[in-house]
Amino acid sequence: MNQTKISLPFGSWKSPISAKMLTEAGIAMSDLRTYKGSSFWRESRPAEKGRQVLMQRDAIGVIQSWTPPDWNVRTRVHEYGGNAYVLFDGGVVFSNFADQRLYWQKTPGSAPIALTPAGFQYADGFFDAANQRLVFVREDHQPSTVKEHGEEQNEIVAIAIPSDGAPLDAGQVLVTGSDFYAFPRVNRKGDQLVWVEWDH
């Protein structure tokens, strides 16, 4: 192997790394999880105005997007966002950034079906298999709630497993009283709920 050594003053060599390369936004992945032999994650796409989509890699290595164009899997709960999707046997339930409502998709690319009414935001969803329900952190942004309390109210709620033709469901309140909630989880027997909470 014949290599010629080149000596140059410090800082005068031509680097393959450019300022453009360092400042250009790249695709980012978050909220990685596995479900029934597949891997799922949220993918942020700067070229699509930061839209976030749910991606899946199945057991044989096929990668596909679940999220149709013009949908954005992202939540505004606590202003920082958080986990914006939950997987269960019937597909995926996700928070859509534009209106913060929960939507259900049965299969990749299928039309999302609205599950919740306007005026609420949801995050940190969990599939409670023992009780066949979904558990979420919910922020109540309804004008009547904000008027009564002076700000939105945070709660942990249970939402029925989606089914065709079911009415919109804002959720049954399980826990309330603190300023913030995160990471609600139910044990396998379905008789204990744990979460993180904090106040201003």
What is each residue range found by the language model?
Residues 1-53:
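Sequence/structural signature of beta-propeller modules
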Residues 3-5, 10, 62-65, 101, ...:
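Predominantly a core beta-strand signature of beta-propeller blades
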Residues 15-23, 64-75, 111-116, 170-175:
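A short beta-strand motif characteristic of beta-propeller blades
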Residues 25-38, 72-92, 119-134, 176-194:
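Conserved beta-propeller blade repeats
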Residues 35, 50, 59, 88-89, ...:
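Short loop/turn segments that connect beta-strands within the blades of beta-propeller domains
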Residues 43-53, 73-79, 94-102, 117-123, ...:
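A flexible loop/linker signature enriched in serine peptidases of the S9 family
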Residues 44, 57-59, 105-107, 161:
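Inter-blade boundary loops/turns of WD-repeat beta-propellers
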Residues 55-58, 153-163:
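Beta-propeller blade signature
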